[in-house]
Amino acid sequence: MNIRQSGKYYEYKTLEILEKNGFKALRIPVSGTGKQALPDLIATKNNTIYPIEVKSTSKDVVTVRNFQIEKLFKFCEIFNFCECHPLVTVYYKKYKIVIVYELSQDVRTKEKIKFKYGINS
């Protein structure tokens, strides 16, 4: 498998972008396994924690399942003593653009969420 085809590549690209923008960030290499509420990445800036799910697509849309969204909110519940904002970053490969979506509580009730280029952005 080509490294650009793997999620790991886009996780590292997101880390680079975050660090260039003054965030402290790290990758959680076991995020997709087990039942723990671990995001792909954790970033901090200005006393706020950002659990991040990283996605990439060669299409105009990407679907994120509820359990992936829910783990971001559960992570925030662990850190309820500070600001915590769950994010999803989507790499739209054909447009060569990254869009960051901040999640609101109402998405927790949905079975899956579709992020569509040009609609949610």
Curated annotation (Swiss-Prot):
Function per UniProt: A structure-specific endonuclease that binds and cleaves the four-way Holliday junctions in DNA created during repair and rearrangement by the ubiquitous process of homologous recombination. Introduces paired nicks in opposing strands; on immobile junction cleaves 2 bases 3' of the junction point, on mobile strands the cleavage site varies. Cleaves Y and loop-out structures with much lower efficiency. Binds 4-way junction DNA but not sequence-identical linear dsDNA.
Protein name: Crossover junction endodeoxyribonuclease
Complexes and interactors: Homodimer.
InterPro entries to which the protein is assigned, alphabetical: Hjc, Hjc_arc, Restrct_endonuc-II-like, tRNA_endonuc-like_dom_sf
Pfam family, one: Hjc
Transmembrane segments: none
KW Cell membrane (keyword) present: no
PANTHER family in UniProt: HOLLIDAY JUNCTION RESOLVASE HJC (PTHR39651:SF1)
Needed co-factor(s): Mg(2+)
Marked site (Transition state stabilizer) residue numbers: 55
Homology family: Belongs to the Holliday junction resolvase Hjc family. Hje subfamily.
Reactions it catalyzes: Endonucleolytic cleavage at a junction such as a reciprocal single-stranded crossover between two homologous DNA duplexes (Holliday junction)
Sites where the protein binds Mg(2+) 2: 11, 40
Active-site residues, record numbering mapped to chain: 31
Keywords, comma-separated and alphabetical: DNA damage, DNA recombination, DNA repair, DNA-binding, Endonuclease, Hydrolase, Magnesium, Metal-binding, Nuclease
Keyword Nuclease: yes
Gene that this polypeptide is encoded by: hjc
GO molecular function ontology, one term from the record: endonuclease activity
Cystine bridges: none
Entry EC no(s): 3.1.21.10
The species this protein was found in: Sulfolobus islandicus rod-shaped virus 1
GO biological process terms on file: DNA recombination; DNA repair
Record-listed Mg(2+) 1 binding positions: 40, 53
